[in-house]
Curated annotation (Swiss-Prot):
UniProt-annotated binding residues for [4Fe-4S] cluster: C202, C205, C213, C216
Sequence motif Cx2C motif 1, location on chain: 202-205
Gene Ontology process terms (BP): iron-sulfur cluster assembly
Region described as Linker: spans on this chain: 121-150
This protein's name: Anamorsin homolog
Organism for this UniProt entry: Caenorhabditis elegans
């Protein structure tokens, strides 16, 4: 078995099993660390003396979940460019678990072992060129405005729009669920008209001067129908 023979040449060899027999030829190899249970393999990550010291590893774990955990552990303690072989009856699962742990699968034998290598590429540092912004590259915000942008809007332009028909000959009316502000505008106009209309205290303003009180705002005006709009002159006659 050439793969195994190559591994046995390295003194920093780690072998993890799930309690089964060891691979033939690993007994008595100088520098070989044998972990006979997966529970002990979990403690490898905390062993400062072992982290980064393993060059080769042999994994003999058949249970899928335990195999994934062992592969992760071996990857953490292994040196860069270190190699691992997994003896498993399910070659597809062994390849997948190695790749998930971070290994690159390099060889799949016709028998049981799957071979992988630890390659960690941190990439190259790239200097960021933020550049220098010159004053001439700055945009004058006032230069983006047109002449009409400086004109004061008229009252009609400030009025709310959006409700009613677009026919210019028809006055727009606020819709039932008005949200454009036209309903509030109509309400304010209505309140202004009510406030502008003179209040009658005696109720006889429309009957004529003979029935009006001395402070009636309609003194001097001809009789009119109740509810009829009457314009009152605010200029005194001299």
């Amino acid at each position: 078995m050439s793969i195994l023979s190559d591994f046995l040449k390295h003194p920093n060899l780690l072998q993890v099993t799930d309690g089964g027999p060891l691979v033939d030829g690993t007994n008595g190899v100088k520098g070989t660390r044998v972990v006979g249970s997966v529970s002990n393999a979990r403690e490898l990550r905390g062993a400062d003396s072992l982290v980064g010291d393993v060059e080769r590893a042999i994994i003999q774990v058949q249970e899928t979940e335990l195999l994934a955990e062992v592969c992760n552990t071996v990857f953490d303690v292994m040196k860069q460019n270190g190699e691992v072989i997994v003896f498993s009856q399910d070659l597809t699962t062994a390849q997948r678990k190695l790749r998930i742990a971070g290994f690159r699968v390099t060889e799949v034998a016709a028998e049981f072992p799957v071979r992988g290598i630890k390659l960690v590429n941190f990439g190259e540092k790239v200097a960021l060129d933020l550049g220098v912004v010159a004053d001439e590259d700055l945009i004058d915000e006032d230069g983006l405005l047109q002449e009409e942008d400086f004109e004061k809007p008229t009252g009609d332009q400030l009025k709310a729009g959006g409700c009613g028909p677009d026919d210019p000959n028809k006055k727009k009316r606020a819709c039932k669920n008005c949200s454009c502000g036209l309903a509030e505008q109509e309400e304010l106009e209505k309140m202004g008209q009510i406030a502008a209309e003179p209040k009658s205290s005696c109720g006889n303003c429309s009957l004529g001067d003979a029935f009006r009180c001395s402070t009636c705002p309609y003194l001097g005006q001809p009789p009119f129908k109740p509810g009829e709009t009457v314009k009152i002159s605010t200029v005194d006659d001299f």
